[in-house]
Amino acid sequence: MKITASLVKKLRQRMGAGMMDCKKALNATNGNIEKAIDLMRTLNTTKSAKKLDRITIEGLVKINISANKKTVTILEVNSETDFVTKSDTFISFVNMLGVLALKTTPTNIEEFLSQPLSNGDSIEKAREEIIAKVGENITIRRVQTIKTNNGIIGTYKHMDRIAVVTILEKGDETLAKDIAMHIAATNPECITEAELSSDLLEREKAIFIEQSKKSGKPNNIIEKMIIGRMKKFVNGVTLYGQPFIKNHDTTIGKLMQLNNTQVKFFVRFEVGEGIEKKEKNFVDEVMAQI
């Protein structure tokens, strides 16, 4: 049977694969689209397995919030390149997972990955099919469910790469969103100084002491220098100590006092944070594609 451009186009639309892959599959199955699909899925399962150890440092974050604004889920899904993250196939996959996360409100990633999709398929099967379509490894890295009875939820997402959820004790959604936006920009370690570990504080203090000794200044001056540097450090890593990004004349702590409320919780996801990208030489890169 003659393999026409129209036939190749139909197979591409159904499989989302490259033109040459579709043409080869149609030639191998004498132009039978259904058999070509089965063949491609079989071959792509093998190809997908080869992609599973590739580093996925790009991706998207997704936030979904319930109608009553008391439950919210935050999700990160990764790919190898930002080219794939912009594809309709990947975006649709992430959107589907976001809806499922809000529906099932999982407590951890393992629980989430065990949930069936609306068509009865497993998330893993859907992931393998996406890998086959886009030609890259895809990982569902993390998910978190946040619930509140009386708090005010604020959310903010920046360029689909940073997502933040906050809960205020009381107040309004605009303030909660402003705090989420601030956290997206500044990435604080925690809310208040009381939450910082003593080990972290002692380590920073030890560094400042050694640096100050080299100044050659009197001990009483050195002590003041250390106190000043520690205060600056604490303010820099705690949410309440940071200057508000929309008004640098006040801190988040003072802003909370002014609005008679408190930040009870926050979580921040940034695509690829904490993932170490392996360095490969050119030959390794080429061989990895085979």
From Swiss-Prot:
Record CDD domains: UBA_EF-Ts
Stretches for region Involved in Mg(2+) ion dislocation from EF-Tu: 81-84
GO cellular component terms given for this protein: cytoplasm
Cysteine disulfide partners in this protein: none
First-listed, main subcellular location of the protein, grouped into a coarse class: cytoplasm
Keyword presence, Protein biosynthesis: yes
Protein's cellular compartments: Cytoplasm
InterPro entries in alphabetical order: EF-Ts_dimer_sf, Transl_elong_EFTs/EF1B, Transl_elong_EFTs/EF1B_dimer, Transl_elong_Ts_CS, UBA-like_sf
Alphabetized GO MF terms: translation elongation factor activity
A Pfam family matched in the record: EF_TS
Keywords: Cytoplasm, Elongation factor, Protein biosynthesis
Family named by the database record: Belongs to the EF-Ts family.
Matches recorded under HAMAP family: EF_Ts
Stated role: Associates with the EF-Tu.GDP complex and induces the exchange of GDP to GTP. It remains bound to the aminoacyl-tRNA.EF-Tu.GTP complex up to the GTP hydrolysis stage on the ribosome.
Protein's name according to its UniProt entry: Elongation factor Ts
